[in-house]
């Protein structure tokens, strides 16, 4: 059975080690970063990816708490274990704040550190208080100071696209961070984490020598759980889950990969699992939607609508690094937000064109995202019922009963209120795309090119390939005639599976499927 309990909700390295909970060993990365030529480092990763635990690990390492690192990789790497003064600031508590509230919050976290260092009459301004802290810690210990700032961008994320509020909060944060530059001689190591890198904040505009490790291949596995770590450090956990699910070990690993794997943070990167979902899956013994359920993507859905991004345009997509590893407050496309928030990830890199292929990482994200997009096309009650319909459709399609699946879909569409009916063909195509995407276990592609045109949708199941052509206010026969006239099926004859053509015609007056035709190619 699994030896250690899972550190769910615990982000403190010291507590995890003292309570002997599961810790995935990241200390080789800690040693590597602490012994490079750099002094300033920044790491961005999506929420709940282990950034706070990483910061806590750095804190205990630089405080020289060697006993906490017994049995870990760094025990054999580090020879000196020098104790440094550490200033640790967690800005995650600074969310959803106005200017005055943020200033008071910064004062609060500064006061906690000032008490540790015996500062009873601090300066007034936040930047001067941080400067005084650095100098006091340096003078009292005779050693350079380590500064750790977790979630540096938390106060600004909520107002990233509200220019007036953003400017006000950004000025406060710029002022707070400014001592990190002119106190350089007193500093041993500075590490900041966040989700995005805001432009015009002093740590990026003034610290020209800051090392950005977010897309560095040497640190691609510093957060999250790599496939190698899963297979070497969590063997008992896999066996316990397999026993609980009555599955083979190999089948469990494959399902874990399907649901929670797929992240890559560099051109060359190990496969990285979402740590929050993976640990919750092992703890609950269920393949649930944990990461997605822990945060509603309301803001993302709003921005998708603002940028007029259609569901089938989200991913896959190609982009230069500068197009997605970029400040989100000035983004011209949705790509930086999708990437930095963890909804898409790197899947490939072309050296010749320097283009990255970005795609949705795994089943949990794909299902969660498209499930949240469905209410854009149907009302809330209909969207909830849609989940039931989609599950039943998937079962029928697995049994090669496409006719039964479309009958279910027709019945479902007829429950959607009239206010969601439109005479725009693209609306029905996108709605159908979302629904077919939610038919988990299948592969879906849209507007697939053939020598003589484009197929609206191609659905690949374990047993069949379906070519789907849509029409609005015409006839299913017209859709089938187009597929036959242009010989769409010949483009797929080498797929090795039976090909079925499906013509679907929508009626804009009812908002439902009027008729359909199914033929074997």
Pin down the residues of each PLM region.
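Conserved catalytic cores of phosphodiester-cleaving nucleases, focusing on short active-site segments
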Residues: 432, 455-472, 486
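Structural motif
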Residues: 146, 464-466, 500
């Amino acid at each position: 059975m699994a030896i250690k309990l899972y550190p769910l909700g615990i982000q403190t390295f010291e507590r995890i080690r003292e309570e002997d909970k599961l810790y995935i060993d990241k200390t080789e990365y800690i040693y590597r970063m602490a012994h490079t030529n750099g002094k300033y480092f920044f790491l961005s990763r999506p929420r709940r990816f282990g950034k706070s635990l990483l910061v806590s690990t750095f804190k205990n390492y630089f405080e020289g708490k060697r006993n906490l690192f017994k049995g870990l990789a760094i025990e054999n790497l580090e020879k000196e274990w020098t104790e440094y003064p550490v200033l640790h600031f967690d800005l995650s508590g600074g969310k959803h704040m106005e200017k005055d509230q943020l200033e008071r919050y910064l004062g609060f976290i500064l006061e906690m550190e000032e008490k540790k260092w015996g500062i009873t009459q601090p300066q007034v301004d936040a930047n001067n208080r941080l400067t005084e802290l650095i100098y006091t810690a340096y003078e009292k210990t005779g050693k350079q100071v380590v500064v750790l700032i977790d979630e540096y961008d938390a106060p600004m994320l909520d107002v990233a696209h509200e220019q007036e509020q953003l400017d006000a909060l950004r000025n406060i944060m710029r002022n707070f961070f400014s001592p990190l530059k002119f106190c350089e001689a007193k500093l041993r190591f500075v590490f900041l984490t966040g989700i995005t890198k805001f432009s015009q904040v002093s740590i990026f505009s003034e610290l020209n020598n800051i090392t950005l490790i977010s897309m560095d291949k040497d640190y691609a596995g510093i957060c999250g759980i790599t496939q190698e770590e899963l297979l070497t450090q969590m063997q008992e956990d896999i066996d316990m889950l397999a026993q609980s699910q009555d599955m083979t070990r190999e089948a469990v690993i494959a399902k874990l990969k399907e649901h929670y794997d797929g992240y890559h943070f560099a051109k060359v990167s190990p496969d990285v699992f979402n740590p929050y979902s993976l640990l919750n899956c092992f703890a609950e013994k269920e393949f649930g939607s944990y990461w997605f359920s822990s945060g509603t993507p309301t803001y993302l859905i709003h921005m998708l609508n603002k940028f007029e991004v259609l569901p089938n345009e989200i991913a896959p997509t190609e982009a230069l690094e500068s197009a997605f590893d970029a400040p989100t407050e000035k983004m011209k496309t949705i790509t930086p937000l999708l990437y930095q928030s963890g909804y898409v990830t790197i899947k490939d890199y072309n050296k010749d064109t320097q283009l990255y292929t970005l795609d949705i990482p795994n089943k949990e994200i794909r299902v969660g995202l498209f499930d949240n997009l469905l209410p854009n096309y149907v009302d809330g009650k209909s969207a909830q019922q849609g989940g039931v319909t989609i599950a039943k459709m998937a079962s029928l399609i697995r049994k090669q009963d496409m006719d039964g699946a479309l009958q279910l879909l027709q019945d479902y569409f007829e429950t959607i209120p009239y206010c969601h009916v439109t005479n725009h063909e693209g609306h029905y195509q996108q709605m159908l795309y979302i629904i077919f995407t939610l038919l988990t276990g299948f592969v879906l592609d849209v507007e697939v090119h053939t020598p003589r045109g484009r197929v609206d949708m191609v659905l690949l199941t374990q047993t069949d390939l379906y070519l789907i052509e849509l029409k609005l206010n015409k006839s299913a026969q017209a859709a089938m005639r187009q597929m036959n006239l242009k010989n769409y099926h010949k483009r797929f004859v080498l797929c090795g599976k039976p090909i079925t053509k499906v013509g679907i015609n929508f009626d804009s007056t009812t908002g439902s499927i009027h008729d359909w035709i199914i033929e074997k190619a």
